[in-house]
């Protein structure tokens, strides 16, 4: 018997026992209600490749060259990646779609490397304004200089942007707003860039609200003058953990393809197949899903505000334009007591301590996953009621079951129909 980190012995690491623990946790997860805005639940259809042999395989022959099958196994299904990319292009109204990134951060690295030379300046959004925490440090590691922009309630200060651009050394404006109930006006940003520094590229990291863009609820950055946009595919878009980048510019696409050769080896074939199936499955439902997601977010925000929670945002405009709802809480102890009661009752929430315009520990909630599973107005009202209850006491043992009983049809293929029609 050996003793490892944390005092664990080899007896504690029996693989069968560990698998049982995973299975038990997975069963609980299947019934839980997840209100974390940076997560979503992949559909049964899209999840199939993740349990297939393709999870073990490389796939490099993106052009389908019959003389380039150095790694075998993908010949018969290579077209699925192409079909999925085409569906994504249609949803984004984009000429080009790059599905090589393996995550949102991978997409960020690829974009920065492709669209800015070493030593140049890249402008991003300050974390205190909702920007991604890692962007400035990542830029430094890649040999770029970082400049930060303020963004208040979704509004970028145009005079500040013009001032940052004026020296002429900015290669890329990388709009990385992740914490947002309002989305910046990309058209106005593009206009400033084209006037002050026409050679500067504009990229929108839409990781959090990608599904709302693809569903037509929020403005398409390409239509607003951005050179490219993209991000992760597992937040408001119900896909696997992957990344995607869209552009209409041939030179941008070529730069991305050139950079990916060095920065992305395996693009994780099973996950790419899963992304393709997710895109093909939701393409015709994406508009309805995006609208329902925002409707549910606004309904949740309003119900919580009516119950006395301090909800961030303007009640006159529905508190949020995205899937996110922010709620201020009364100190760390109260925040974790609420989160623990909810988790024990099967409702998962996201605590944050660095949200723009808010102090202390607070809730960052998302309507995206429960909407994908079929939550409608009544279910959302009862979810809000569960949060109200959890401020004072534990939830009842059937609370989640009863809320799920209010769900309508999900935005994905019925699993039983899938088994019959696919012969599974």
UniProtKB/Swiss-Prot annotation:
Enzyme kind, highest EC tier: transferase
Xref: Gene3D superfamilies: Aspartate Aminotransferase, domain 1, Type I PLP-dependent aspartate aminotransferase-like (Major domain)
Reaction(s) this enzyme catalyzes, per UniProt: uridine-5'-aldehyde + L-threonine = (5'S,6'S)-C-glycyluridine + acetaldehyde
Gene Ontology MF annotations: glycine hydroxymethyltransferase activity; pyridoxal phosphate binding
Pathway: Antibiotic biosynthesis
SUPFAM superfamilies assigned to the protein according to its UniProt record, in alphabetical order: PLP-dependent transferases
GO process terms (BP): antibiotic biosynthetic process; glycine biosynthetic process from serine; tetrahydrofolate metabolic process
Modified-residue entries (N6-(pyridoxal phosphate)lysine), positions: 235
Pfam families to which the protein is assigned, alphabetical: SHMT (PF00464)
Keyword Transferase set for record: yes
InterPro entries in the cross-refs: PyrdxlP-dep_Trfase (IPR015424), PyrdxlP-dep_Trfase_major (IPR015421), PyrdxlP-dep_Trfase_small (IPR015422), Ser_HO-MeTrfase-like (IPR049943), SHMT-like_dom (IPR039429)
Cofactor(s) named in the record: pyridoxal 5'-phosphate
Record's keyword terms, sorted: Antibiotic biosynthesis, Pyridoxal phosphate, Transferase
Gene Ontology CC entries for this record: cytoplasm
Activity-pH dependence: Optimum pH is 7.5.
EC numbers: 2.2.1.-
Role description: Catalyzes the condensation of L-threonine and uridine-5'-aldehyde to form 5'-C-glycyluridine (GlyU). Forms (5'S,6'S)-GlyU. Has no activity with alternative amino acids, such as glycine or serine.
Family: Belongs to the SHMT family.
Protein name according to UniProt: L-threonine:uridine-5'-aldehyde transaldolase
Source organism of the structure: Streptomyces sp
Chain's gene name: lipK
